[in-house]
């Protein structure tokens, strides 16, 4: 009993560099069978062993060191495996290591009982590290991932196996016409606003655009000189977006029969013109020489009358245009003369004001007196003979 107690206490001490890989059971002699001793654990059943683990902050160890996983699989016999049999999860150096066997019962086969170092480390790793959002690349030298053996799940069950091997799927482009405004992201809202702006400006008239602006922002002030309207993202809500979509749908339904009628009218005009041309050519080919001559004569007469009518109309149009041009020239001439008269009057008025200002400032005409003289000419009754 004393030997077993001393062996137990010796394995509960701190790890030393000379003993980097302690076994989980009591010391055995060479050649002893593991199943013969009670309370011993056969390591070949698992093919892995946690060599050392720090009690320091795992997140700090993640950033300062790289995790290395090595494995040789669980199918290798215990006699063929050497030191490569054991999977090691090394977190930095071997300094300041604590024994994995603290508070561990040797009669239990639970690798990581509650409260042990390994359970603390595994829970700390799963707490400090978010595997779903990490860009951490797992390096597994010597392990066959395709064979189905998951060393990581054997060592620490709380960590998901190979989290970064499954590639993240990109989000598919959603149909924005079926989404509510609150269900869209900021980028989707901007994209949908640009789509609505292009659709409304290209397919609708000015009245419809004003109606949509009033739906989006009832208090918007639009002047006749505005050429664009900026839509703020915070002005739109789910209800307003629903009203805009319904308005656009109703407008497209109203415009559809008009477009179809216009297309049908164009097609019917083209078809009737083609039929009339074909019938005219057929009748002209089956007509006799006399009828063709008479038709040609009548066509010549009609063309002559049409040309004379066109000439008279052109002459009357030219007369009208000449009289209109003459009236325009007269009005321009009168307006020019009026402007010249106004300019001369303004110039004379400014000159008189300037002269009066100069006289007042000089003081030379303060005692000025204006005298009015009237000269009367006497009529000479007698004629003067200039020859004398």
Swiss-Prot record:
Coiled coil: none annotated. The gene is Fam199x. Residues 288-358 are annotated as: Disordered. Disulfide bonds: none annotated. It comes from the Eukaryota. Residues 288-312 have a biased composition (Low complexity). Belongs to the FAM199 family. InterPro entries: FAM199X_fam (IPR029672). Keywords: Phosphoprotein. Residues 330-349 have a biased composition (Basic residues). The modification Phosphoserine is found at residues 316, 321. It comes from Mus musculus (Mouse). This is Protein FAM199X.
């Amino acid at each position: 009993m004393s030997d077993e107690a001393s062996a137990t206490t010796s394995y509960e001490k701190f790890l030393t560099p000379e003993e980097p890989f302690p076994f989980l059971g009591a010391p055995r002699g060479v050649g002893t069978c593991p199943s013969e001793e009670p309370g011993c654990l056969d390591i070949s059943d698992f093919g892995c062993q946690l060599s050392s683990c720090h009690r320091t902050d795992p997140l700090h160890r993640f950033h300062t060191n790289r995790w290395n996983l090595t494995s040789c699989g669980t199918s290798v016999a215990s006699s063929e495996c050497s030191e490569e049999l054991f999977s090691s999860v090394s977190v930095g150096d071997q300094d300041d290591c604590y024994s994995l066997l603290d508070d561990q019962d040797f009669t239990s086969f639970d690798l990581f009982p509650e409260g042990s170092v390994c359970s603390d480390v595994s829970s700390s790793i799963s707490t400090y590290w978010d595997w779903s959002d990490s860009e951490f690349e797992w390096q597994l030298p010597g392990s066959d991932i395709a064979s189905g053996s998951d060393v990581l799940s054997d060592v620490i069950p709380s960590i998901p196996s190979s989290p970064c091997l499954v590639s993240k799927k990109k989000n598919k482009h959603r149909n924005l016409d079926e989404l509510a405004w609150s269900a869209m992201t900021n980028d989707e809202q901007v994209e949908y606003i640009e789509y609505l702006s292009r659709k409304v400006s290209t397919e609708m008239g000015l009245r419809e655009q004003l109606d949509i602006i009033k739906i989006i922002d009832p208090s918007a002030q639009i002047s006749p000189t505005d050429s664009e309207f900026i839509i703020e993202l915070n002005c739109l809500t789910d209800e307003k977006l629903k009203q805009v979509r319904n308005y656009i749908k109703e407008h497209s339904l109203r415009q559809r029969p008009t477009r179809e009628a216009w297309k049908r009218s164009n097609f019917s005009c083209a078809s009737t013109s083609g039929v009339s041309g074909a019938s005219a050519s057929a009748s002209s080919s089956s007509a006799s020489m006399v009828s063709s001559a008479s038709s040609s004569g009548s066509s010549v007469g009609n063309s002559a009358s049409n040309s004379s009518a066109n000439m008279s109309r052109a002459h009357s149009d030219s007369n009208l245009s000449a009289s209109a041009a003459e009236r325009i020239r007269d009005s321009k001439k009168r307006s020019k003369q009026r402007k010249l008269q106004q300019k001369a009057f303004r110039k004379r008025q400014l000159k008189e004001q300037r002269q009066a200002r100069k006289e007042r400032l000089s003081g030379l005409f303060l005692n000025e007196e204006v005298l009015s003289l009237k000269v009367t000419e006497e009529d000479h009754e007698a004629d003067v003979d200039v020859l004398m």
